[in-house]
Amino acid sequence: MTGIVGYGAHIPSYRIKVEEIAKVWGDDPKSISKGLVVNQKSVPGPDEDTITISVEAARRALQRAEIDPQDIGAIYVGSESHPYAVKPTATIVADAIRASPNLTAADLEFACKAGTAGIQAAVGLVKSGMIKYGLAIGADTSQGAPGDALEYTASAGGAAYIIGEDNTIADIEHTCSFTTDTPDFYRREGQAYPSHGGRFTGQPAYFKHVLGAANRMLEETGTTAKDYDYAVFHQPNGKFYIRVARKLGFTEDQYKQGLLTPNIGNTYSGATPLGLASILDIAKPGDKIFAVSYGSGAGSDAFKITVNDRIEEVRNNAKTLEEIQSKITYVDYATYAKFKGKIKMN
């Protein structure tokens, strides 16, 4: 069965606390942390971007997959913060991991679900027999305007998945999607920061689509929340994540391992892939995982995944998320603003 052959993740080591941002804008940090269920977020260093995050994650995925990168037939990088408007991130990743030029590669965009869209595309190509392995990455160095609510959550990170049919560590048993034209969040070409619909981003956007894809998955597979060991969802903040998990009948024991936002913020295209990676870091053979992404604009992709025996053989070939986050450095707002290019000089 087609599934995950290897996975890898990367999160920058810099962090900024909610209190530090709130101090600059005169906001109440306790109210913000409680409302968003976010305490701090990751910050990309001056030498980090979507490309470097993608490369690190891809290399770790290869370490676990134990395959020749020359056998990868497709590379997709999903992000809304590609460094170049015209120059693919995917080709740079391909060169960095020493993949063959005999492949198809593309940068994907669908707000925060571009990474899972890449996984679906790779699954389709592998199942069709067109390629042996596909590499799908979801990564971002997300943006939030100074003083905007997004500034408390917009962060950086990503995860990579190698999809194939042989020696899988987890089978992707089913996938489905739910998509509509919903203008909840957008950024035009040339704009530094996105615009969003405030409360409109909740019920008619995030919840409608995540629940739409999730309920479709449960119906098509004939399963309920009780049939899964773990669940992970897109996490623009901790509040939405917990609410949608509970609406679907999942317990804290099922959803807490995939909830990373309180300590790293919203990694956008990396959010659901990173949450899934966190689950794979501890999952046992036979465990069943329910995963649903979300991207503004708007749509959700859902996956039913079952973990295989091989995961215990290769899990320690690369750093786990716990190890990646073991060494962090806190920065003040001035350093954060400098790293993120928020200070513009004429």
From Swiss-Prot:
Its EC number is 2.3.3.10. The active site is at E80 (proton donor/acceptor), C112 (acyl-thioester intermediate), H234 (proton donor/acceptor). It comes from the Archaea. Keywords: Acyltransferase, Isoprene biosynthesis, Transferase. It catalyses: acetoacetyl-CoA + acetyl-CoA + H2O = (3S)-3-hydroxy-3-methylglutaryl-CoA + CoA + H(+). Pfam families: ACP_syn_III_C. The keyword Acyltransferase applies. The keyword Acyltransferase applies. Signal peptide: none annotated. Pathway: Metabolic intermediate biosynthesis; (R)-mevalonate biosynthesis; (R)-mevalonate from acetyl-CoA: step 2/3. One of its GO terms (biological process) is farnesyl diphosphate biosynthetic process, mevalonate pathway. InterPro entries: ACP_syn_III_C (IPR013747), HMG_CoA_Synthase (IPR004656), Thiolase-like (IPR016039). It is an enzyme of class 2 (transferase). Interacts with acetoacetyl-CoA thiolase that catalyzes the precedent step in the pathway and with a DUF35 protein. The acetoacetyl-CoA thiolase/HMG-CoA synthase complex channels the intermediate via a fused CoA-binding site, which allows for efficient coupling of the endergonic thiolase reaction with the exergonic HMGCS reaction. HAMAP family: HMG_CoA_synth_arch (MF_01409). Belongs to the thiolase-like superfamily. Archaeal HMG-CoA synthase family. This is Hydroxymethylglutaryl-CoA synthase. It comes from Methanosphaera stadtmanae (strain ATCC 43021 / DSM 3091 / JCM 11832 / MCB-3).
